Curated annotation (Swiss-Prot):
EC class: hydrolase
The protein's Enzyme Commission number: 3.2.2.27
Keywords linked to the UniProt accession: Cytoplasm, DNA damage, DNA repair, Hydrolase
UniProt-recorded Gene Ontology molecular function terms: uracil DNA N-glycosylase activity
Protein name: Uracil-DNA glycosylase
HAMAP family per record: UDG (MF_00148)
Stated role: Excises uracil residues from the DNA which can arise as a result of misincorporation of dUMP residues by DNA polymerase or due to deamination of cytosine.
CDD domains for this protein: UDG-F1-like (cd10027)
UniProt organism field: Xanthomonas oryzae pv. oryzae (strain KACC10331 / KXO85)
Stretches assigned to coiled coil: none
GO biological process, one term: base-excision repair, AP site formation via deaminated base removal
Chief location bin: cytoplasm
One GO CC term, this protein: cytoplasm
A Pfam family annotated for this UniProt entry: UDG
Length: 241
């Protein structure tokens, strides 16, 4: 068992489906890389117990929607294991502000006073980054080190073993990762990334949130409540907050 396997435990339903990847040579190489970076003083985010937080929050059989991100936020205290999300009290990042703007325009839901998306995850929205770690101040520092193999395996397993999921693919990176998705089995919505650099090219106005709920309701599945409680009412259990 590698150090990472010993320290981080996958949620049981996910471990049964994709835990085999933790035993492969890619994981051993990734574990060695993470140890080496920490040995030279690199600050790795998110903290170890939160690396697999997306899986803890949304068990395999409870997934309704998948939002694919790229890699974690690289600022102090930002990343906590859910793509696009930050802990309560951390300033809302620009991409998430645009997500909130689209939700408001699409559904009339007012922007919340925080960037904590755990309530979505607990309803079945898997907030999955392609790369699960990063280093302070170095965006993309852990790309092409092995995480992509694991998260590809996650997407492929969902594609194969579930049916009727909604995949929200924002930006070329997410859309490339989502090429394996069988659109006869699942609903895929694509748009530019919500970053301020690209949101105006088609993310704003995409109506993905209402379209997602319409798809779920057509299948007899309860829709996602995209509203978020105010910060002073949040349940931050297991969030590291």
């Amino acid at each position: 068992m590698t150090e990472v396997e010993a320290r981080i435990q996958l949620e049981p339903s996910w471990k049964a489906k994709v835990g085999d990847w933790l035993l492969c040579s890619q994981m051993q190489e990734l574990s060695a890389f993470l140890r080496q970076r920490k040995a030279v003083g690199a600050r790795v985010f998110p903290p170890g117990p939160q690396i697999f937080a997306a899986f803890d929050a949304t068990p395999f059989d409870q997934v309704k929607v998948v939002i694919l991100g790229q890699d974690p936020y690289h600022g102090e205290g930002q990343a906590h294991g859910l793509c696009f999300s930050v802990l309560p009290g951390v300033p809302v990042p620009p991409s998430l502000l645009n997500i909130y703007k689209e939700i408001q325009d699409d559904l009339g839901i007012a922007r919340p006073d925080h960037g904590y998306l755990m309530p979505w995850a607990r309803q079945g929205v898997l907030l999955l980054n392609a790369v699960l770690t990063v280093e302070q101040g170095r965006a993309g520092a852990h790309q092409n080190k092995g995480w992509e193999g694991f998260t590809d395996h996650v997407v492929e397993t969902l594609n194969r073993e579930r049916e009727g999921l909604v995949f929200l693919l924002w930006g070329s990176y997410a859309q490339s990762k989502g090429r394996v998705i069988d659109q006869a089995r699942h609903r895929v919505f694509k748009a530019p990334h919500p970053s301020p650099l690209s949101a105006h090219r088609g993310f704003l106005g995409c109506q993905h949130f209402s379209k997602t709920n319409a798809h779920l309701q057509r299948r007899g599945i309860s829709p996602i409540d995209w509203s978020l409680p105010p910060r002073n009412e949040l349940d931050t259990t297991s969030a590291g907050a």
